[in-house]
């Protein structure tokens, strides 16, 4: 969610809070404010707008999850030509790439995972109605492993289910790009589920572990970012397959001759090759690399040779001056030397 959208929602919810205080009752707030809030959010599909109006308490959490995904995207690609800073058409709380590239695949997966992560966390913290801790993971004893369920396990199934209904509702068109988007959404959620953690606590006299209770917790989102970045590097090129009498694509297969093997559930998939992202291009969502900082000596993607696409780079020199080697003299003053340092910064032409 961009700052303008978050500020808008914040003002709307502040207004709703005032209505709540004056009239009293959450149902009144929902009745008066849900349609206002949901109509102010750009890019919602009809089903998403209906969900928003029925569950306005969840829409802020969904926005935070989407923003968390975008922030992680920018972190993971901070040193690349494409740095997730500018995307194409507007979506739920952000933008999307028009080209069905591996970058688009990563974007969909990380945002889908972010929304599911945020919903699950909000349930665990008691910040959403209709959900809480995982009730099925309470009191059951695992005799072979010597522990039982206790504490508050994160209800990942609820989080994933709610996020799936909302995020996937945007995919209205029946084409190859929709199949790609839905697959990557599911891959992001699946990877989140596979990386859930088990935490345990011992109970007993003098630090003994007579009994042990365990519960599931969400992974740090940064961990998911690294896993999905690896999936991005190994993304699978796919193509749509149409049934004999159906013009609409029905599933995706790996793009290899004489192969009808489907990608794995946790694979990121793409249908178009990535542009080089060297030049600014609104169609592909590329902001170009002109003016980007680069590393003169690094051989990786952040190195000037790769980052600047062979155009060369500018050198900027800066001088930093500060007080150093300060000593206290009796009595009573401090004497310092003046230190200076020259640094160079390189930016793409």
Swiss-Prot record:
InterPro entries: Wnt (IPR005817), Wnt7 (IPR013300), Wnt_C (IPR043158), Wnt_CS (IPR018161)
Region (Disordered linker): 238-266
Main location: secreted
Signal peptide: 1-31
Record flagged with keyword Secreted: yes
Localization: Secreted, Extracellular space, Extracellular matrix; Secreted
Keywords associated with the record: Developmental protein, Disulfide bond, Extracellular matrix, Glycoprotein, Lipoprotein, Secreted, Signal, Wnt signaling pathway
CDD domains linked: Wnt_Wnt7a
Keyword Signal: yes
Superkingdom of source: Eukaryota
One term of GO molecular function: cytokine activity
Family: Belongs to the Wnt family.
The name this protein goes by in its record: Protein Wnt-7a
Organism of origin: Macaca fascicularis (Crab-eating macaque)
Record gene name: WNT7A
């Amino acid at each position: 969610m961009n700052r303008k959208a978050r500020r808008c929602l914040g003002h709307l919810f502040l207004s709703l809070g005032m209505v709540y205080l004056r009239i009293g009752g959450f149902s009144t707030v929902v009745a008066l404010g849900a349609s206002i809030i949901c109509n102010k959010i750009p890019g919602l599909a009809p089903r998403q707008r209906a969900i928003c109006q029925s569950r306005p308490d969840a829409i802020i959490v969904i926005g935070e999850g989407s923003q968390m995904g975008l922030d992680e995207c920018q972190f993971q690609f901070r040193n690349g030509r494409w740095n997730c800073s500018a995307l194409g058409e507007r979506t739920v709380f952000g933008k999307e790439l028009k080209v069905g590239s591996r970058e688009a695949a990563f974007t969909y997966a990380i945002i889908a995972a972010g929304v599911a992560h945020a919903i699950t966390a909000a349930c665990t913290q008691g910040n959403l109605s209709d959900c809480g801790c995982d009730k099925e993971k309470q009191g059951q004893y695992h005799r072979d492993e010597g522990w039982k369920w206790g504490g508050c396990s994160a209800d990942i199934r609820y989080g994933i289910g709610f996020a799936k209904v909302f995020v996937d509702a945007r995919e209205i068109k029946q084409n190859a790009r929709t199949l790609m988007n839905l697959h990557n959404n599911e891959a992001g959620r699946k990877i989140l589920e596979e990386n859930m953690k088990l935490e345990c606590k011992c109970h007993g006299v003098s630090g003994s572990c007579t009994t042990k209770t365990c519960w599931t917790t969400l992974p740090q989102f940064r961990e998911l970012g690294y896993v999905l970045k690896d999936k991005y590097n190994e993304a699978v090129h796919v193509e749509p397959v149409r049934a004999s009498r159906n013009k609409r694509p029905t599933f995706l297969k790996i793009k290899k001759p004489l192969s009808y093997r489907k990608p794995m559930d946790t694979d990121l998939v793409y249908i178009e090759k990535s542009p080089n992202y060297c030049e600014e291009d609104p169609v592909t969502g590329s902001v170009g690399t002109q003016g980007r900082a680069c590393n003169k000596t690094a051989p990786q993607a952040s190195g000037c040779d790769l980052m600047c696409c062979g155009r060369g780079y500018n050198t900027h020199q800066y001088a930093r001056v500060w007080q150093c080697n300060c000593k206290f003299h009796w009595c009573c003053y401090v004497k310092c030397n003046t230190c200076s340092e020259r640094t160079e910064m390189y930016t793409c032409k």
